[in-house]
Amino acid sequence: MPQIVIAALYKFVSLPDFEALREPLQAFCIENEIKGTLLLAQEGINGTVAGRREAIDALLAYFGKDARLADIDHKESYEEEQPFYRMKVKLKKEIVTMGVEGIDPNNIVGTYVEPKDWNSLIDDPEVIVVDTRNNYEYDIGTFEGALNPNTESFRELPEYVAKNLDPAKHKKVAMFCTGGIRCEKSTAFMKQRGFEEVYHLKGGILKYLEEVPEEQTRWKGECFVFDNRVAVNHALEKGTYDLCHGCRYPITEEDKKSEKYIEGVACPHCHDTQTPDQRARFMERQKQVQLAKARKQAHIGAPAPSRQK
């Protein structure tokens, strides 16, 4: 029976005192042996953490004492082992970085679509479906018929919209992401740019996989997640991908058979682009990981997925 609860959570809400929230939140999580990363900004909170059931319940109760965070959106999955190495609470300009001034999902946002209604929406031939995630996420799984903006970071999405989508031509646009935060900000951006009918999947892919039976799914593949599981399948169990710790790209068993794969160092995606200094640094890091593993200790510097959510 899984012992660890993994909670992905976020909320867009005005937090003018966000800097003062950091230290008490960090201390609470450490005291309760919760690990992961939380981002605080004036626009809200975002992150993924993991701990025992009672610890995560205590964290939700902690948020509940602040009226602004009492109804924080959170989704859970479960694992046998802690997927994170440490606890970090970071201060940021944005909780998900788009880099466009004046976007505020607290004031304007697209229409939320419940997971049970998502299939009907994306089956509509008039609806353009846009995956707001990045290439490495799209490559391992997405919804049937979804457009890939071919982005390497969320910052590139506005440029994709400017070049490829037109409010006068694309009357209905549906957007989705892993947990809901990127598509919420994306639809706020779209509304600001004059798109009228803009929809986004409430709770993101993870909520869809949780609530929609696999026999009814429009999802194809696995879903990239930002912890050491790398990806999850439709049952929200650890999928078949591992992570290249050189470039943070998800890799398959086939990739590992390549002559360009070096465990913990490089893979076919990054082998030919690494500098000698990078290669040496990654080799030394992997050596330390192996030494820690031999001593049955967690290597505190062991890399975990850190790409933009």
UniProtKB/Swiss-Prot annotation:
Disulfide bridge partners, by residue number: none
SUPFAM superfamilies, per database record: Rhodanese/Cell cycle control phosphatase (SSF52821)
One GO term (biological process): tRNA modification
Catalytic residue positions: 177
Gene Ontology MF: a single term: oxidoreductase activity, acting on paired donors, with incorporation or reduction of molecular oxygen
Family from the record: Belongs to the TrhO family.
Function: Catalyzes oxygen-dependent 5-hydroxyuridine (ho5U) modification at position 34 in tRNAs.
Database matches in NCBIfam families: PRK00142.1-3, PRK00142.1-4
Name recorded for this polypeptide: tRNA uridine(34) hydroxylase
Species of provenance: Saccharophagus degradans (strain 2-40 / ATCC 43961 / DSM 17024)
